[in-house]
Amino acid sequence: MAKDIKFSADARAAMVRGVDMLADTVKVTLGPKGRNVVLEKAFGSPLITNDGVTIAKEIELEDHFENMGAKLVSEVASKTNDIAGDGTTTATVLTQAIVHEGLKNVTAGANPIGIRRGIETATATAVEALKAIAQPVSGKEAIAQVAAVSSRSEKVGEYISEAMERVGNDGVITIEESRGMETELEVVEGMQFDRGYLSQYMVTDNEKMVADLENPFILITDKKVSNIQDILPLLEEVLKTNRPLLIIADDVDGEALPTLVLNKIRGTFNVVAVKAPGFGDRRKAMLEDIAILTGGTVITEDLGLELKDATMTALGQAAKITVDKDSTVIVEGSGSSEAIANRIALIKSQLETTTSDFDREKLQERLAKLGGGVAVIKVGAPTETALKEMKLRIEDALNATRAAVEEGIVAGGGTALITVIEKVAALELEGDDATGRNIVLRALEEPVRQIALNAGYEGSVVIDKLKNSPAGTGFNAATGEWVDMIKTGIIDPVKVTRSALQNAASVASLILTTEAVVANKPEPAAPAPAMPAGMDPGMMGGF
């Protein structure tokens, strides 16, 4: 395929146009008075959202060079979302600010490599300063406060803090759609392990790329499943019940995997295969945990069992199983309460005798998975559009809350970024490195400027007053008042803020050091088919 190539200033200018189109769309959502963005969907009603990463992923530009700039910023939002689960709009605003300030200096003749070095040094200093002013989050009330700020709903904050109290900070919390209009919290027994489906063709929901199995059977084995004939009699028995099947095995390969996938695609029966969690002796123990939780038996040579001899009585059962590309969640296993209690007691006794910190950590993980359960927040709303928007907000809030528990909190509303300016400004750098530092200093102001602008205030005035205010005091854009941010509950998780800054600085630096951009040349439109010989155009009925 032929390529289009742009160089130097032309290349950077084209990419920056794409950066601006995406960032200008996303940044209107920032802050307590941020607006919504309406996204057209190929099917169904439009999606109304203020979630930065959701908006960024939807944007495709016609110009290939501009689209590359937009996609790089979208990558910043996605990466921040993957690491911290929130802060995607802040990351986008920071990226745009660093790119714009950097481009001015590069155009004026500054060395992009020196600027990049200065940006990296200043960013590292800002991150350390953020960690130094972080306050730990503990207690139900503090957790509820973090969740309420992220979701813009005190009720959601209460649900998330209640869920984390019930299943632990590292417990499994899922978000589902409610059948009614009310949002409610439900805690059910369950287990999660870090293994996803072996083929994406096994998913049942193509939009979310997850496989949901209702009332499934579970085959648990530490063997490889390579020959489909080994499990064919068992598959035929499961097929008669018209219920789905989850296969947990050392691996599923050879002819077995394509055969299972083909039957899934044809709709013969619903089957999902995942690899067994853990390794070595720990894998055997975890498979036994799953078997006890689900009322099944591990098909293993240790018990003298072969796959070809497995019967329906060896299969575990559960009310529901959800599998995505990275993890499997088993909800309401059919194992007996007595067997589960005995297993928990055994693990606790092993905890008392182990001398290895690593073994202790893994035993505690197994204990939490067996006894902790799964919290389900069932989201209700009057319309489908409102339901989707609410789900996105709760997902962001849950991620932000976990990030806050992990690394602590700082004053929100961009205040913490203004606070660390003093530390960054104190860096003694020279030449283009100093220019890079100054670019970061200007970018650190941008989230506050945008929050103020979205709320109808002049950003520069707010920033000047903020720089001269006592530590911890900030601007509440929702009310227009100057308050103690943390006491008022306007807070941001450190992990969210630092991830946004680190990812923004990384990608913005790459854009500034770009000297050539290569894009695919658009394919020429195919010529219209020739009219048959001897045919009179007037015979076409005037169309």
Curated annotation (Swiss-Prot):
MF term (GO), any: isomerase activity
Cell division among keywords: no
One biological process term in Gene Ontology: protein refolding
Alphabetized CDD domains for the sequence: GroEL
One cellular component (GO) term of this entry: cytoplasm
EC number(s) from the headed UniProt entry: 5.6.1.7
Catalytic activity: ATP + H2O + a folded polypeptide = ADP + phosphate + an unfolded polypeptide
Keywords, in A-Z order: ATP-binding, Chaperone, Cytoplasm, Isomerase, Nucleotide-binding
InterPro entries registered for this protein in UniProt: Chaperonin_Cpn60_CS (IPR018370), Cpn60/GroEL (IPR001844), Cpn60/GroEL/TCP-1 (IPR002423), GroEL-like_apical_dom_sf (IPR027409), GROEL-like_equatorial_sf (IPR027413), TCP-1-like_intermed_sf (IPR027410)
Domain of life: Bacteria
Positions that bind ATP: T29, L30, G31, P32, D86, G87, T88, T89, T90, G413, N476, A477, A478, D492
Pfam family, one: Cpn60_TCP1
Main location: cytoplasm
Cellular compartments annotated: Cytoplasm
Family annotation (PANTHER family): 60 KDA HEAT SHOCK PROTEIN, MITOCHONDRIAL
Subunit structure: Forms a cylinder of 14 subunits composed of two heptameric rings stacked back-to-back. Interacts with the co-chaperonin GroES.
Family to which this protein belongs: Belongs to the chaperonin (HSP60) family.
Its job: Together with its co-chaperonin GroES, plays an essential role in assisting protein folding. The GroEL-GroES system forms a nano-cage that allows encapsulation of the non-native substrate proteins and provides a physical environment optimized to promote and accelerate protein folding.
Name listed for the protein in its UniProt record: Chaperonin GroEL
Species name: Streptococcus pyogenes serotype M3 (strain ATCC BAA-595 / MGAS315)
